[in-house]
A protein has these predicted regions:
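Conserved S-adenosyl-L-methionine
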Residues: 229-239
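Class I SAM-dependent methyltransferase SAM/SAH-binding core
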Residues: 57, 63-111
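Core SAM-dependent methyltransferase catalytic element
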Residues: 246-265
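Acceptor-substrate binding/catalytic loop of class I
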Residues: 131, 203-218
Length: 265
């Protein structure tokens, strides 16, 4: 049984931390919409038929990087986030004219009962990151109930396996430079910032924020568990840059990634 008071306290703490990071979010976290990123979400959104007659919901919209495109393409747009600071930044990004076309909701992603069977496309970009797996499951079930029959969920989740891939490359470089295995592991742990991660359970902690990073099999498992079908997974490919632990000349290797998913209700 979930202790509701504990859950509410955790949500309040996370709302405060996410709001505090809202102004500099785009500078701190890797942007799946940045130039040079290969993001399958754009093609998936472009494939939605008759978007002008459909309702799209950006769940956990954050600072709203996707909202201008959604507002231009879809007939009705919902922007939901539990952090008021994020919604404030999203409104600023849109500007007054576009913001009037968007319905803003300040609430958690699992609070969708009043939207049951009203959404055609639900989008979640780096927002299914709750550190409690029970809340992730509850949120996915809520999203499925909010979708009309045949509606689609699509989104991006941060990848824990890409951190392990990055670590492997750094370890090899350190060994090739003559470090001992023990020295190479310390070098890798420092530059890949292992202190922030729980690799067994996909946990991430940074300046008060707590997030879930995903293995691909978890995406398949949890979406299926929530009742979704026809699931597909693709990589969001990021060019190597400073946020990946410094310039260690990794450009000769395949890029790092997050996971893009889409499924049908």
């Amino acid at each position: 049984m979930i202790n509701v008071s504990d859950r509410d306290g955790t949500l309040r703490n996370q709302k405060r931390h996410w709001s505090r990071h809202a102004a500099n979010y785009d500078d701190v976290f890797i942007d799946p919409f940045a130039e040079g990123v290969e993001n399958p979400l754009w093609m998936a959104l472009g494939a939605v038929a008759d978007p002008g007659g459909k309702t799209v919901a950006d769940l956990g919209c954050g600072t709203g990087p996707l909202l201008p495109s959604l507002a231009e393409r879809f007939g009705r747009v919902i922007a939901l986030d539990f952090a008021p600071g994020m919604l404030e930044q999203a409104r600023k990004r849109l500007g007054p004219q576009q913001a009037r076309r968007v319905r803003f909701l300040e609430r958690p992603m699992d609070d969708l009962d009043d939207l049951a069977e009203q959404i055609d496309v639900a989008v979640s970009v780096n927002s299914l990151v709750m550190p409690d797996e029970r809340l992730i499951d509850r949120t996915l079930r809520a999203i499925r109930r909010s979708l009309r029959a045949g509606g689609r969920v699509m989104g991006i989740v941060p990848s824990i396996d890409s951190i392990q891939y990055h670590s492997m490359l750094l370890l090899d470089q350190a060994l090739e430079q003559g470090l001992t295995p023990a020295e190479a592991r310390r070098f890798t742990a420092y530059h890949a910032e292992h202190r922030y991660y729980d690799f067994a359970f996909g946990g991430f902690r940074f300046e008060g924020l707590r997030q879930k990073f995903w293995f691909p099999f978890e995406v398949e498992y949890r979406l299926s568990k929530a009742g979704f079908r026809d699931l597909s997974l693709e990589k969001v490919l990021y060019p190597w840059h400073d946020l990946f632990g410094g310039d260690f000349d990794l450009k000769a290797h395949p890029p790092s990634w997050d996971w893009f998913f889409q499924a049908v209700a």
